[in-house]
Swiss-Prot record:
Belongs to the membrane-bound acyltransferase family. This is Membrane-bound acylglycerophosphatidylinositol O-acyltransferase mboat7. Its EC number is 2.3.1.-. Residues 1-5, 58-73, 212-230, 443-467 are cytoplasmic.
Length: 467
């Protein structure tokens, strides 16, 4: 493990026991202590680069104060343009930010855009209440516009400051105002989330030592046979998953220990978004709680869901919620594959400027189009047994597609990514294009069958009338 990874691990490990202490604090003390601890972590790991995140926060606050109506669009433009400056600071003679500063900046970008949307919703709903004299039906809406102190406290809250998960300002405010945090579940769900982390960590270390990523860039790698080169991406994606499984499960445990994102099960919370329905518990029955709001990874479904599009739902779930609510609806396209492509383009930009991100993320819409074509033209014609076989083949190809795309994500450079993909003959791209072509061909045949069947039925009807 690199020194940076050890620092991440140390911060993650420390936040879990610290979280339990926060349950004993009153709301004002909890807010101040969480801010202080977050600032200590930020300054200790980022130093002077903490100013980047502070500029982002202050800029968003100014936008909200000046024009809350247009704040969502303006904050998105501001934070994403600042990301560009942040990544090109060396062009202006400024020092390169640390990886820790980059992690904080990424999560802060999501928080600021979400905050602007929440404030806009608050003002719009308040106007409706005044004009209609009725209570707003919005679930989990703000009760007041956050002050500058509130915004800074939310931005630098120590929980998930570098590792996520993303959570809305309302989730943060609900955490501060919990009436009896000591009575909420903590130890058991925390241990439940941590129980597989040692396994993930050991698998990460073991497989990474046998299949190092750096070997892919060597000339010796290309001397191996095709099947070895193909299998290597399977191992690399396995290492990638184990790394993030362990990190995100640990980050979720840090939220759970502090009680952040704890809501009654009846609230039907969504990862990242929080409650989706208003919930009034029955005073005569025990209330059961969950931490769905801060769930960032579903390890089982990531591995065993069938479709490429479903795989995205279970990976980095809170960020997927953010993309689905703030980017996907505003895409300048109507077709699902094109809207997904737009969303993936924005996601790639959020991750960074390396070409490998774009090559990987923009392969996803192609795979989605391929699986959609095959489902409509092939799976729909099969019986239950045939569909079961189809789904297993689909799952296998889904995993290989993510293996393939992961290589661009970790190799980063366009030359390295294309060099590897060419060494396995761009197999996933070719399979996807073939699937789309087969789907279109069979779709055309199905239309001809329907047309011929319809013409035959018309001829039979005419013949019956003549007789």
């Amino acid at each position: 493990m690199s020194p940076d990874e050890l620092v991440y691990l140390g911060i993650l490990a420390a936040t879990i026991p610290v979280g339990f202490l926060f349950r004993y604090l009153s709301p004002p003390v909890k807010q101040g202590a969480a801010l202080l601890l977050g600032l200590i972590i930020s300054i200790a790991t980022c130093g002077i680069h903490t100013l980047h995140s502070l500029c982002t926060v202050l800029g968003t606050w100014i936008i909200i104060k000046i024009n809350w109506r247009s704040a969502p669009a303006l904050s998105l433009a501001w934070t994403f343009l600042y990301l560009l400056f942040f990544r090109l600071v060396t062009w202006f003679g400024l020092p390169q930010p640390t990886p820790f500063a980059n992690a904080i900046q990424l999560l802060l970008t999501l928080k600021m855009v979400s905050l602007a949307n929440e404030v806009q919703s608050y003002h719009l709903e308040r106007k409706k209440e005044v004009s209609t004299f009725t209570k707003s039906p919005v679930v989990a809406g703000l009760s007041h516009e956050p002050s500058l102190y509130d915004i800074i406290s939310y931005s630098y809250c120590y929980v998930g400051i570098m590792t996520g998960p993303f959570f809305r300002y309302q989730t943060y405010a609900d955490w501060l105002q919990q009436s009896s945090p000591l009575s909420l579940p903590g130890k058991e769900p925390c241990l439940q989330r941590l129980k597989m982390v040692p396994v993930y960590g050991l698998l990460f270390i073991a497989v990474n030592s046998v299949f190092p990523l750096s070997y892919v860039r060597t000339e010796d790698f290309l001397e191996h046979n095709y099947f070895y080169r193909f299998f290597y991406m399977v191992a690399i994606f396995f290492v990638f998953r184990m790394r993030f499984y362990s990190a995100w499960c640990g980050a979720e445990a840090g939220c759970i220990s502090a009680g952040l994102g704890c809501y009654p099960q009846g609230a039907l919370s969504k990862p990242g978004g929080g409650p989706t329905v208003k919930y009034s518990p029955d005073p005569e029955t025990a209330v059961e709680y969950d931490f769905k709001t801060i769930q960032n990874i579903d390890c089982y479904n990531t591995d065993f869901c069938v479709k490429v599009r479903h795989g995205m739902r279970y990976w980095n779930m809170t960020v997927q919620w953010w993309l689905h609510h703030y980017i996907y609806p505003n895409a300048p396209f109507r077709a699902y594959a094109l809207r997904a492509g737009w969303t993936m383009l924005i996601s790639a930009y959020w991750h960074g400027l390396h070409a490998g991100y774009y090559l990987s993320f923009l392969t996803i819409p192609l795979c989605i189009a391929a699986e959609t074509a095959m489902e409509a033209s092939v799976r729909a014609r099969l019986g239950p047994a045939g569909q079961n076989i189809f789904d297993w083949i689909h799952w296998f190809l889904k995993m290989r597609a993510y293996d393939y795309m992961c290589m661009g994500f970790v190799l980063l450079k366009a030359s390295d990514t294309i060099s590897y993909w060419s060494s396995i003959y761009f197999v996933i791209h070719i399979i996807a294009i073939v699937c789309i072509a087969v789907g279109q061909f069979m779709k055309g045949g199905r239309k001809r069958e329907k047309r011929e069947r319809g013409e035959g039925e018309k001829e039979d009807a005419v013949r019956e009338k003549a007789e």
